[in-house]
Amino acid sequence: MSDDNQTKLEAADIQALLAVLPHRYPFLLIDRIVDIDGDVSATGIKNVTINEPHFTGHFPENPIMPGVLIVEAMAQTAGAISLLQRKTGRPGVVYFMTIDNAKFRRPVVPGDRLLLHVKKIKQRANISKYECVAEVDGVKVAEAEVAAMISVADENL
């Protein structure tokens, strides 16, 4: 699904992510992206640590990463690869639109390294749908389909 408005990039470190995503601590939920195949697929990496603020209340004696944050991390990975591939000088913003078929299979806890596999399964104009799978140590912990829209800074929603 490549076109003339895309550039070749195979990985993105935290600085590259900060350059394209509006999220910041504590809501930037990916640390790095690897295995980037254009705007079609990639793997986000989230190193889960006990220092994250949501563990204070979810749950104090048994810290578990909230499922909604796992889905958000998958969506950030999908959004980031869309934005990283753009060659246009106009900044874009990705708006999360839908979550479908979300399933949570096992808890994610501090110390886990969350791999967020995203693959574009559909695109129409500026709206893309991604199949997402989150894994820890090769075991599927969550999955969902997410849809998002890219909006260019000077366009109206």
UniProtKB/Swiss-Prot annotation:
EC number(s) from the headed UniProt entry: 4.2.1.59
Catalysed reaction, written as an equation: a (3R)-hydroxyacyl-[ACP] = a (2E)-enoyl-[ACP] + H2O
GO cellular component, one term: membrane
Subcellular location, record wording: Cytoplasm
Catalytic residue positions: H58
HAMAP family referenced in this protein's UniProt entry, alphabetically: FabZ
One GO BP annotation of this record: lipid A biosynthetic process
Keywords assigned by UniProt, alphabetized: Cytoplasm, Lipid A biosynthesis, Lipid biosynthesis, Lipid metabolism, Lyase
Protein known as: 3-hydroxyacyl-[acyl-carrier-protein] dehydratase FabZ
Described function: Involved in unsaturated fatty acids biosynthesis. Catalyzes the dehydration of short chain beta-hydroxyacyl-ACPs and long chain saturated and unsaturated beta-hydroxyacyl-ACPs.
Family matches, as NCBIfam families: fabZ (TIGR01750), PRK00006.1 (NF000582)
Principal localisation: cytoplasm
The family this protein is said to belong to: Belongs to the thioester dehydratase family. FabZ subfamily.
Enzyme class at the top of the EC tree: lyase
Single GO molecular function: (3R)-hydroxyacyl-[acyl-carrier-protein] dehydratase activity
Statement: the UniProt record of this protein carries the keyword Disulfide bond: no
Superkingdom field: Bacteria
Entry annotated with the keyword Magnesium: no
